[in-house]
From Swiss-Prot:
HAMAP family: Lumazine_synth. InterPro entries: LS, LS/RS, LS/RS_sf. The gene is ribH. (2S)-2-hydroxy-3-oxobutyl phosphate binds at A85, T86, R127. It comes from Geobacillus sp. (strain WCH70). Pathway: Cofactor biosynthesis; riboflavin biosynthesis; riboflavin from 2-hydroxy-3-oxobutyl phosphate and 5-amino-6-(D-ribitylamino)uracil: step 1/2. Belongs to the DMRL synthase family. CDD domains: Lumazine_synthase-I. One of its GO terms (cellular component) is cytosol. This is 6,7-dimethyl-8-ribityllumazine synthase. Pfam families: DMRL_synthase. The active site is at H88 (proton donor).
Length: 154
């Protein structure tokens, strides 16, 4: 049996991060976690590009543009969508998830979904570096693994 998997060595990888400014008190913590994860796995800080967008809904377009540029081995999408009193939450979450998936599938570049979709601010805080770890860190490690896995197809 042949097993294919990516390693977690980030040396030489070029990574783009698309991050939402909305809920920045959460997303900035996701970015810190992602940068820490990338650096600890050997990605040079100079090989990381960060693109800020107004909100989560704008993430897919910029993620796709970055992936299409072929300058990056992976793109990480970071954001925080917190449920409110209207159905807006559902629309945003669904469209962002579909858009990020489409960006990856249409370009062949890994686009990692690191967008929190939580019911409460407390849940978002927990996932941005407290009780439930840091989903930015997890997204960074996934980006490294997927970039290296895709290299096995070259």
């Amino acid at each position: 049996m042949k097993v294919m998997e990516g390693n977690l060595v980030g040396t030489g990888l070029k990574i783009a991060i698309v991050i939402s400014r909305f809920n920045e008190f959460i997303t900035s913590k996701l970015l810190s976690g992602a940068m820490d994860g990338l650096k600890r796995h050997g990605v040079n800080e100079n090989d990381v590009t960060v693109a800020w967008v107004p909100g989560a809904f704008e993430i897919p377009l910029i993620a796709k543009k970055l992936a299409e540029s072929r300058q990056y081995d992976a793109v990480i999408a970071l954001g925080a969508v917190i449920r409110g009193a209207t159905s807006h939450y559902d629309y945003v979450c669904n469209e962002v998830a579909k858009g990020v998936s489409h960006a990856a599938l249409s370009t062949g570049t890994p686009v990692i979904f690191g967008v929190l979709t939580t019911d409460t601010i407390e849940q978002a805080i927990e996932r941005a570096g407290t009780k439930a770890g840091n989903k930015g860190w997890e997204a960074a490690v996934s980006a490294i693994e997927m970039a290296n896995l895709l290299r096995t197809f070259a």
